[in-house]
Amino acid sequence: MLRSLQHVESHINQCRRISTTSTLLKNRAGKTKSTSNRTQLLTYEMAQKPHHIGVRKSWLTWHSQNLEEFRQSQPLVVAQDEVVRRFIRGFFPQNLVVSGNEIVIKRRGNVLIVAGFLQYSRRLDIRRIYWMFGFAEEFLSILLKQPVKLELSFVESEETVAYNYI
């Protein structure tokens, strides 16, 4: 009995050293799935791989949150970002490009900068656009108690922003 137990133990130890299973290749994080008829729009930022975030997309990562004077707690930053995204989606509902996913929120010192693209509609006149920008900046500044600057660009259509279709 003792001999058979030793045989089983040596067999288990040998199995631990050699792996015979195939790899599952489940390292596809951040990769967008392609469609059968290439209808899904990709912008330049969406087309980049996640490991290029610090190289090709570094302008998205410049922030001042690690400086001692401007440090904020993580839940506060996440809540502020969600408030800004929901406000922009609600205030410019007909003008959003790529369903509002391309809104970039940057923090430089005490200033919150919101960048992105809006689709130009023929119904908007220039006075209304300036009023909407001014109101949005002022409302978000009062709500978040820090200066907010909008850097939103208007494009003719979503195809202008498209980098690739998959």
From Swiss-Prot:
It is found in: Mitochondrion. GO terms for cellular component: mitochondrial small ribosomal subunit. GO terms for biological process: mitochondrial translation. Its main location: mitochondrion. It comes from the Eukaryota. Residues 1-25 form a transit peptide. Keywords: Mitochondrion, Ribonucleoprotein, Ribosomal protein, Transit peptide. Pfam families: MRP-S24. GO terms for molecular function: structural constituent of ribosome. Component of the mitochondrial ribosome small subunit (28S) which comprises a 12S rRNA and about 30 distinct proteins. Belongs to the universal ribosomal protein uS3 family. This is Small ribosomal subunit protein uS3m. It comes from Caenorhabditis briggsae.
